[in-house]
């Protein structure tokens, strides 16, 4: 009897192990060896020149029917070193971002507005379907089914894996502002360290190109010319056979007479399958409640993975100081899909004249975009030299390299930012305040490090009682 029970237990263990292995193999976004960060990023072919960092403004602006897009320079030394790309979309009401995919994973921060989006996950079913009985009773001859439509709002962090097509639509009455971060040195990108966008429709201008490539095109007289979508390069007869359509529809598919860009204005009603409003609100409530629950790895499949997390709400703060501000983070612990794309993010809010304690990121670069206000920022390199000491204003981007130490102090207007990290579990190491490097060192080590008395070492170690977000004023947070 004991042998039979042992045999049954072993068979069950083998079966469960096989099931788990199969689940892991089903995910096309899973990469092996996630513990070693360097294995997942291509190294820059040239040495990084980081002795003079600059707060970057967009270098180009392209306007279209329902949008204007601003692009930072891909050829910039700092962006090339980090292997990142930044874009800002401003989409007008009823603007539709046409479906497309890119060669690098992206994070999108919703800085303003709300809307809906669709993301076509390979191999997943079209779970939104027309009610045939209702359509027939209404006299409609059309039926539709598609993958899930996902709402988003201000403060959301959206994830778009490499090679996965997605679209977005502005449902609000005001502009929708999206901050787009692309990790072009991610292991998912097998081409080159430049962002390439592949569109399924329209004739979009390739504004993502770097300045060097743009200037080469200008000398050839092709700057500003629209390129085609991915179907425009195929022969008509191939497309006719592939889609079982006629030549007239093929020409529309290829966009031969279409002068629209990447985002178009929807004049008529935008019809997609969406849950009823009350059902959507109930679902949103369940989503908010379940968002903080722990994941066990079996509750989500690749087709139902959460692809967003709101990091703008104050109740989600990971660090909070009622006089200084707050910081919220999104990593693979809170949003499991980030483990697949190897990225994370941080949302920060500093009140007037508050400060972020000196710190560095252990295992990633940080690309900081200022969403509101301005701050004085200082960055120091491994030689103890200041590589940036200046103001970062709303709309600017500052790349902070891995292990470079940074301090931020907000102006009278306060300061807010979103920082994108090139690691799915970016680790911050503090140098002052609670849980900092100074607190971890013995007094004897501190006194000999700086040739100070034990009393001075005591003040240095325990003088700052706050953690990371510091209240305004030099005397704030000190022990009495």
From Swiss-Prot:
Mg(2+) binds at residues 408, 468. Keywords: Disulfide bond, Magnesium, Metal-binding, Pyrrolidone carboxylic acid, Seed storage protein, Signal, Storage protein. The keyword Metal-binding applies. The keyword Metal-binding applies. Residues 51-251, 309-458 form the Cupin type-1 domain. The modification Pyrrolidone carboxylic acid is found at residue 22. Residues 1-21 form the signal peptide. One of its GO terms (molecular function) is metal ion binding. InterPro entries: 11S_seedstore_CS, 11S_seedstore_pln, Cupin_1, RmlC-like_jellyroll, RmlC_Cupin_sf, Seed_Storage-Functional. Transmembrane segments: none annotated. Disulfide bonds join 48-81, 124-303. Gene3D superfamilies: Jelly Rolls. Hexamer; each subunit is composed of an acidic and a basic chain derived from a single precursor and linked by a disulfide bond. Belongs to the 11S seed storage protein (globulins) family. This is a seed storage protein. This is 11S globulin subunit beta. It comes from Cucurbita maxima (Pumpkin).
